[in-house]
């Protein structure tokens, strides 16, 4: 039996260095689950490591992709066979077959459709944990990269948690109608004056951009406010020390590394229920061989759909 996978064997732009390769399927390893993948989304966290941005811990040759959903096809225990799971910490999810340690397999309830389950890990869990660590009930909140999946979840769930006002910094004007419909106060990324003004009013900032935008906000936040940095979509670092406060960083992998398996598995019980009540972009499904088209959609400014690879 053969496996098909998207590999990168050197750093570079994903469109240039990813290759779809067919290789013989390795022998099954006892103690793991062999998962036949159904869908995997295209996220910034899938593509950024390919460029070499995290070369201190992620390096080629490697299969791309960090999340997705599939069905268990082989296991030591027959009770696993046929169950849908998220195979976390496997060897890359942009492939037809993933071998996953049993403790890192998250069962998916029957009520959750594949296209939602496939994107049920990185962005939802990060947003949920940040709001758990930095609760926002009764507070004013600002999110950057407001059109991104994680920021969209943060904004929705902040309002659900009882945030007073939620501001969203956007880049593409195509995002404006959706932000207004969601009750988010929109701030154009080009309007530094309004961003600075809003920063002076808010209690918590969830920032995925970094660079000059993070620096601008840090310079205008009051001494009781908090800025949580969870990404660098700008590709530019910034000094975490502002005039009044020091930025705090959130990394999902760091949280999982110090959390007992039983505890974080339990988080998903709450997360699945919440996701079923949450607005998400429609999926645009591409066959694995159409991965270039999936990346092209991902790059479109103001896109309204989430690209998924059908594996």
Question: Residue spans of the language-model regions?
Answer:
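Glycine-rich beta-strand-centered segment in the early N-terminal region that forms part
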Residues: 24-42, 51-92
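NAD(P)H dinucleotide-binding glycine-rich loop of Rossmann-like/cofactor-binding domains
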Residues: 84-146
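Short acidic-hydrophobic, aromatic-tinged amphipathic segments that line or gate anion-handling sites
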Residues: 185-192, 285-290
